Regions:
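Short S/T/G/P-rich N-terminal loop/turn motif that feeds into the first structured element of a domain
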Residues: 1-57, 61, 65-72, 99
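C-terminal structural segments of small proteins and small subunits
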Residues: 64-88
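Charge-dense polyanion-binding interfaces
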Residues: 85-99
Length: 99
């Protein structure tokens, strides 16, 4: 399965230092051992189209072999630390899980 998360950072966190800290936090998430592969991304510079949403600041795509592996990730201390450290940084977060 795939776990996709989109983050919109608060305006006051849109500076290079805070963005670097946020990227470090995301990269730490990828150390959870049930992850098969993971990617951190920013919006692509594609043409503006009515169906394309490029308003988010960061996205992650995390792949797991099983739903159980995903559940381990959700309850993992590394995930808990990320949420605790950064939950006040985002204005909005969206999760889209694919089977």
């Amino acid at each position: 399965m795939e776990h996709h998360v989109y983050f919109w950072l608060k305006e006051e966190k849109q500076n290079p230092e805070d963005r670097a800290k946020f990227e470090e936090g995301i990269d730490a998430l990828f150390r959870v051992d049930t992850i098969q592969s993971a990617l951190r991304a920013v919006p692509a510079k594609t043409a503006v189209r009515p169906v394309t949403d490029n308003s988010w600041d960061y996205a992650i795509n995390v792949k797991f072999a099983t739903l159980a592996d995903h559940d381990v990730y959700q309850d993992h201390p590394i995930h808990d630390v990320f949420v605790a450290d950064f939950k006040d940084w985002w204005a909005k977060v969206e999760v889209k899980d694919l089977a």
